[in-house]
Every structure is written in structure tokens, then in C-alpha cells.
Amino acid sequence: MSWMFYSFIVFTLAIKEVIAIDGLEICSNDQLHVTIYSIFSPLFDKPKLNYYFNCSCPGSIYISDVYPKYFNDIAHIEYRCKLT
């Protein structure tokens, strides 16, 4: 199923941090919910982080535009609309 394919994506960042990003493909009510599970520092002290991004569907976002402290431009997300 396609939702299983999209539900768990792992990014390897240029700073050699490995994070798992879950639940990021749906833009609902102009918000994109991103749950980030940290494997290594600098996010190790917060193993689970929830972020909400403004979005318009369909589209994409670079997380580094919002949180440059933790991510770089490799952390790019493409998302789709929630079916209503």
C-alpha cells in the first residue's frame, strides 16, 4: 500500500546525523505534521520531536528553511493533500 511506503522515511544528512521522519506526507488544513525520531546527537536529548509547518497542497518544503539548527537542505519533504 502506498501509505505504508510514505509513512516512514529515513534521511541521512550531510552532517552525518541520521533521523527518521514519520507522518510527513499529508498536508491537512494548511498544516504539515512532521514527527522526527532522533538516532544521534544533536537531537539525542529529544528523541521525538513534533513540528507543524504551514503548507499548501500539493508542494514541498526544505526543513532547513524553518529549523536550520538541526537540518540542512538535504532534509527535503514532498507532501500531498489530505483527501476530504
Swiss-Prot record:
The secretion signal range is 1-16
Keyword match Secreted: yes
UniProt keywords, alphabetically: Disulfide bond, Ion channel impairing toxin, Neurotoxin, Potassium channel impairing toxin, Secreted, Signal, Toxin, Voltage-gated potassium channel impairing toxin
Q: Where in the cell is it found?
A: Secreted
User: What molecular functions are annotated in GO for this chain?
Assistant: potassium channel regulator activity; toxin activity
**Description of post-translational modifications:** Contains 2 disulfide bonds.
Q: What is its main location?
A: secreted
Please indicate which superkingdom the organism of origin belongs to.
Answer: Eukaryota
User: Is the keyword Signal assigned to this protein?
Assistant: yes
Q: In which tissues is it expressed?
A: Expressed by the venom gland.
Question: What cellular component GO annotations does this protein have?
Answer: extracellular region
Function comment: Inhibits voltage-gated potassium channel currents in DRG neurons. 200 nM of the toxin inhibits current amplitude by only 25% and even at concentrations up to 5 uM, the toxin does not inhibit all potassium currents. In vivo, insects injected with this toxin showed signs of neurotoxicity including twitching, paralysis, and body contraction.
Q: Which family does it belong to?
A: Belongs to the scoloptoxin-11 family.
Name of this chain's protein: Kappa-scoloptoxin(11)-Ssm3a
Q: What species was this sequence derived from?
A: Scolopendra mutilans
Lineage in the entry?
Eukaryota, Metazoa, Ecdysozoa, Arthropoda, Myriapoda
